[in-house]
Amino acid sequence: MKISILGAGSFGTAIAIALSAHGISVNLWGRDHRNITHINTYRKNLKYLPTYHLPDNIYATSNIDEVLSDNNTCIILTVPTQQLRTICTQIQHKQHMCKNTPMLICSKGIEITSLKFPSEIAEEILQYNPIFILSGPSFAKEIAEHLPCSIVLAGDNKELGESLIEKISNDVLKIIYHQDIIGVQIGAALKNIIAIACGIIAGKNLGNNAVATVITKGMNEIKTLYIAKNHSIDLHTLIGPSCLGDLILTCTTEHSRNMAFGLEIGKGRNINTLIDHNLKLVEGTSTVKPLISLAKKLNVELPICISIYNLLHENISLDKAISNILS
């Protein structure tokens, strides 16, 4: 069995390690030719996860043609949401190589230009490929260390989804199926912004009670947007790994880049400097603008998210933002 992964960052590399450890041949694609050469030569991704060994059944390449073929059981996309449209367009131009191959998308967030979630972007472009979302509480380093996580595969085709789970689920990647593809992505997008808020509260030493308050209110904001976008709610999604599980993980540890980013803000670091240094790594900073635009379009209020938006982009004071978050 062969699986290709588009995106040789931390998460793509970790997924490759977890799959290859269970006998699956993995093609790992990335743009950085030098880093790709290092992976194949030294069996380590020196740019991301440099301390972890990559088994010999992982082949890295910067040539996208090498990873797009009908022999793939599936193709996993781990690129940032703002780059997803470009990658999907590249795939679409080579549709003859991978027509009908399932696409499993790990991107989290909302596209700035269209206000679309990752699955909506992919479905618009890749009309001949089954689209699934793979999401849940899953730090890359823990996956690379073969520590277990519970994640969700969401998509419309239950039979195909469950068949894929049988093939790729293992003792590290414990995967469950959901049909609620939009609900899963709403939780994945908002949790990063809520984690920034939790980091700010922790950085200001306002206590665990206040952090718990933010998580609780944040869960309500996920529910609010979920109902407005989906016109219904699936409780299994809301309290499952992709919403509640990912929210708890992202909001309660400094290993979360979004929580750590908020922590530095709470400690008084300059916000613009932090954004400049972390823009590509902290998903919440690129999600908050399109999220607020989407909330306005759907006529819903998200107090925590608008507070973070105003803090990052409208220059309100930190104390005012904290007051709004906790009010």
From Swiss-Prot:
Cellular localisation: Cytoplasm
EC number: 1.1.1.94
Species in which this protein is naturally found: Ehrlichia ruminantium (strain Gardel)
Function statement: Catalyzes the reduction of the glycolytic intermediate dihydroxyacetone phosphate (DHAP) to sn-glycerol 3-phosphate (G3P), the key precursor for phospholipid synthesis.
Any Pfam family hit: NAD_Gly3P_dh_N
Binding of NADPH, residues: S10, F11, R31, K108, A140, R257, L281, E283
Enzyme active site: K191 (proton acceptor)
Keywords, in A-Z order: Cytoplasm, Lipid biosynthesis, Lipid metabolism, NAD, NADP, Nucleotide-binding, Oxidoreductase, Phospholipid biosynthesis, Phospholipid metabolism
GO CC annotation terms, alphabetical: cytosol
Pathway(s) this gene product operates in, as recorded in its UniProt entry: Membrane lipid metabolism; glycerophospholipid metabolism
A GO BP entry: carbohydrate metabolic process
Name under which the protein is recorded: Glycerol-3-phosphate dehydrogenase [NAD(P)+]
Residues annotated as binding sn-glycerol 3-phosphate: K108, G136, S138, K191, D246, S256, R257, N258
Record family assignment: Belongs to the NAD-dependent glycerol-3-phosphate dehydrogenase family.
InterPro entries the UniProt entry points to: 6-PGluconate_DH-like_C_sf, 6PGD_dom2, G3P_DH_NAD-dep, G3P_DH_NAD-dep_C, G3P_DH_NAD-dep_N, NAD(P)-bd_dom_sf
Catalyzed chemical reaction(s): sn-glycerol 3-phosphate + NAD(+) = dihydroxyacetone phosphate + NADH + H(+); sn-glycerol 3-phosphate + NADP(+) = dihydroxyacetone phosphate + NADPH + H(+)
The organism's taxonomic lineage, starting at the top: Bacteria, Pseudomonadati, Pseudomonadota, Alphaproteobacteria, Rickettsiales
One GO MF term: glycerol-3-phosphate dehydrogenase [NAD(P)+] activity
Primary location: cytoplasm
